[in-house]
């Protein structure tokens, strides 16, 4: 056995963060490999990136499957994968998604001499608000089989009280030969939240998301139009309660008018409606919305903007440390474009060597950073700005309160429409039921039965 196998539930051309990171590792390592993955036909595809990855893929095992994180889907990927793969001296798997680690575990148990590298992108058990990311593992047959192996090794046993993702972390920590984390805080959080005792001190490494060679930034030229009379800022990605983009909005609102007029914001996101509620009217007028784009076009486009914005997730009160290192950072580094990192205090991103860094919920610091960026880009002398933070926060709160009120009005209006539609549906359903009842009464009536022979005669003369 000499060949290496990549086990990745999502893999190029399927367009996900995980499949792109796996593709980047393959392109950086430049070694021939085999791959086993799921088809995931309903997820967007990126065939341009696949063309470059295929240079190193000798054999690809494709398991027909729709995307699902349910146990039946995981089990299917595991069972079907085991029918296809054999003869590998080294395997590599990456989660998210846990399907990959479960299949890798199965192969390792059946081939103990195989070296297994297992990478974790993020903590798998909990997310914000202590919310579980998966359901309970209720497959008693699987639990019983694994527990026999764990008992032989003197390990704690799993049960139907454990989450699927929890079992994935625990078993991977035990049986993998090498554990890969993207950063130290991620490791600390995962070990802290795991309800089992396991020591991985001798087999873990840190490996941040890879940055591709410069040639890949020129592989797919983008024809996206930029007006060089302005300073063009770009943000790629989504927003959610713990990554809100609020700090950029607040900074923009408190810089000088001449700098505001020079800014153009370009958003590549599926969250247009959310951004439209968040942005102020002035900033919204200076913003261009775009859908997500293919990965290689994104790399090329990242070289064309003046500033790339990346923001930490706000994790205080949710984790002992911030375990997340935005994957965009590795791509931005290769672009040679100015990066503005809006960080959480003491996060992994805050420790990186980035010229422009500011911090979440630090209004004066964010304003000062944006002011510095604009002065540098316009070749102007930096001027000090005076901010009445309390007054601004009142204004911003009023603005957001009004937006919330507008959204409530929209929701109530849509709800009333739904009520009207439901009433109409109920009315039509009642009419149909009455017609069916009348029809049934006619068919069962004596007059209908008596005239049966006459109807037959009538058909003959037609």
Task: Identify the residue ranges that each predicted region occupies.
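Boundary detector for helix-to-coil junctions that initiate low-complexity/charged tails
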Residues: 402, 406-462
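Short N-terminal targeting/anchoring amphipathic segment
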Residues: 82-100, 112-119
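A short, active-site helix/loop in glycosyltransferases that binds the activated sugar's phosphate group
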Residues: 41-47, 159-203
